[in-house]
Design a protein with these regions (language model features):
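N-terminal targeting signals for export/organelle localization
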Residues: 1-41
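C-terminal cap of thioredoxin/glutaredoxin-like
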Residues: 1-16, 125-182
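Generic structural "secondary-structure junction" signal
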Residues: 17, 22-25, 53, 95, ...
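Generic detector of well-ordered alpha-helical segments enriched in charged/polar residues
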Residues: 34, 106-110, 120, 140, ...
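Alpha-helical structural motif
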Residues: 38, 101-105, 115, 138, ...
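A short beta-strand-turn-helix
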Residues: 41-60, 82
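Solvent-exposed, well-ordered amphipathic alpha-helical segments
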Residues: 54-62, 99, 108, 112-115, ...
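Structural alpha/beta surface segment adjacent to cysteine/selenocysteine redox centers
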Residues: 59-135, 147-152
Length: 182
């Protein structure tokens, strides 16, 4: 079913596609299973193509694919501002079919003197990055990397164990995800 989880009864007479929720535990069991099935080997990520930002002691790690003009990425950045003791590897991934100016903005962010601060200023304060004449960026490589990893939307982030989380999450949810990974 196109890479989606399908539930069926014993003789496969009935099936459904969707989220299976454990109401007692208030957990989305489908999402948890998808995280495992779509995990990656984070040791193979080309970290030189990412903007690195360390908050606090940086003992926990997030690998984030994000588009500077994605509204959900803006929301995630607001939530990440409340998360401490984390190292963030930010892979700029402009999705130009949705956000035509995102590639230009991503290039300006990458070429900035303080990349992560410029990223935060743009997402949180709507401050346009300074125009740059030119610099070499990994943005095209990040687009190819995202395709290789089946990252088809932003934000998408990976935890230290390689498990995938698609979409924005609250600071509390991010904390729970980080605590669940040794």
């Amino acid at each position: 079913m196109g890479g989606r989880i399908v539930y069926t009864n014993e003789d496969a007479k009935y099936f459904f596609v969707g989220n299976l929720i454990d109401l007692k535990e208030q957990k989305n069991l489908t999402e948890e299973r998808e995280r495992v099935l779509t995990a990656i080997d984070v040791k193979k990520l080309p970290l030189d193509q990412a903007i690195k930002h360390v908050k606090g002691n940086g003992e926990r790690v997030l690998y984030i694919f994000s588009d500077p003009d994605c509204p959900y990425c803006h929301q995630l950045e607001k939530e990440l501002a409340q998360v401490n003791n984390v190292t963030i590897y930010l892979f700029l991934y402009p999705i130009t079919r949705l956000h035509p100016n995102a590639a230009t903005v991503a290039e300006q962010i990458w070429c900035a003197k303080d990349q992560y601060q410029t990223w935060q200023d743009y997402l949180l304060k709507k401050k346009t990055p300074a125009k740059v004449t030119s610099c070499t960026t990994p943005i095209e490589k990040n687009i190819q990397l995202a395709k290789t990893l089946d990252v088809d939307g932003t934000p998408t982030f990976f935890l230290k164990d390689g498990s995938r989380v698609s979409g924005t999450r609250s600071a509390g949810e991010i904390e729970l995800l980080l605590k669940a990974v040794p």
